[in-house]
Amino acid sequence: MIELFFEYIFPLIIIALKVVAITIPLILCVAYLTYAERRVIGLMQLRCGPNVVGPFGLLQPIADAVKLLFKEPIIPTNADKILFVLAPMITFILSLIGWAVIPFAKGVVLADINVGVLYILAISSLSVYGIIIAGWASNSKYAFLGAIRSSAQMISYEVSMGLVIITVLLTTGTLNLSQIVEAQRTMPWWIDLMLMPMGVVFFISVLAETNRLPFDLPEAESELVAGYNVEYSSMGFALFFLGEYANMILVSAMTTTFFLGGYLPPFNISWLDCIPGFFWFVFKVGFLLFCFLWIRATLPRYRYDQLMRLGWKVFLPLTLFWVVLVSSVLIYTDHLPNV
């Protein structure tokens, strides 16, 4: 009986504890990211932002959560009730599942699988289903139009994102995210320089992937009221909101892992190794999240045809050319990894 416990049940308990250890801090980070966004944008616009609830407004996310929790959930009369309720749950759960393969520090990862990149791409592609289901189930033209926009936008930028990731795989020779980070420890500086433009393209693509300004066409307030979540209230609206911000943190972690060295110190400076890798990971993710907020505060929304043109006529040819360029340079210099 004891052998059975240690062989089958104990590993499941450890996995459950790891999931809780990642999920609870992540939800807290998502809650306080909304607070940080309002404060940062407020300061950029010479306003105070939320500063009443608690010291410096730090209890504002808790007040917002309590308010949304006690709101009445309203389901439209002609909506598909089951799908209407399921859609925000799908979006939120998928935004959390992606964290399973992200390495926070050396050896600190929930599932260190050898196909981590494919797993991340699969999860990010599935997240659009929650939005499409919400738009269709709401039985509203605004919600449906927002859902169609979101699916078209995601398809357009998933292609260039995939090609950018191929350039990373060519230089590191692995699909394991922990090994990708470790490969950057010994990577020559000129390869880092060659990947830098792709890092910029990847970051712009994930802005479109997460429906953030200047690519927030699926929920354009001035055109579609609120897009795919126009009919949602209470916790349904809150789950969409949490899912969007959790995705922001996830794609920032992906960008950090692929292009900024993950948990490694900046520029591989050896004397900075004394600082824990988790600190560097959080610092880099925090910087990218600040860029998200900065872009939202300063840039206007793209027109929809401009958004599509950027994805198909600029990013797709550029990333295709860069894949050929990187592979040619690696073969010529004999730096192609032995897989």
Curated annotation (Swiss-Prot):
One of its GO terms (biological process) is aerobic respiration. The chain crosses the membrane at residues 9-29, 82-102, 115-135, 161-181, 187-207, 235-255, 275-295, 311-331. It is a multi-pass membrane protein. InterPro entries: NADH_UbQ_OxRdtase_su1/FPO, NADH_UbQ_OxRdtase_su1_CS. It is found in: Cell inner membrane. It is an enzyme of class 7 (translocase). GO terms for molecular function: NADH dehydrogenase activity; oxidoreductase activity, acting on NAD(P)H, quinone or similar compound as acceptor; quinone binding. One of its GO terms (cellular component) is plasma membrane. Pfam families: NADHdh (PF00146). It catalyses: a quinone + NADH + 5 H(+)(in) = a quinol + NAD(+) + 4 H(+)(out). Its EC number is 7.1.1.-. It comes from the Bacteria. Keywords: Cell inner membrane, Cell membrane, Membrane, NAD, Quinone, Translocase, Transmembrane, Transmembrane helix, Ubiquinone. NDH-1 shuttles electrons from NADH, via FMN and iron-sulfur (Fe-S) centers, to quinones in the respiratory chain. The immediate electron acceptor for the enzyme in this species is believed to be ubiquinone. Couples the redox reaction to proton translocation (for every two electrons transferred, four hydrogen ions are translocated across the cytoplasmic membrane), and thus conserves the redox energy in a proton gradient. This subunit may bind ubiquinone. Belongs to the complex I subunit 1 family. NDH-1 is composed of 14 different subunits. Subunits NuoA, H, J, K, L, M, N constitute the membrane sector of the complex. This is NADH-quinone oxidoreductase subunit H. It comes from Rickettsia bellii (strain OSU 85-389). The gene is nuoH.
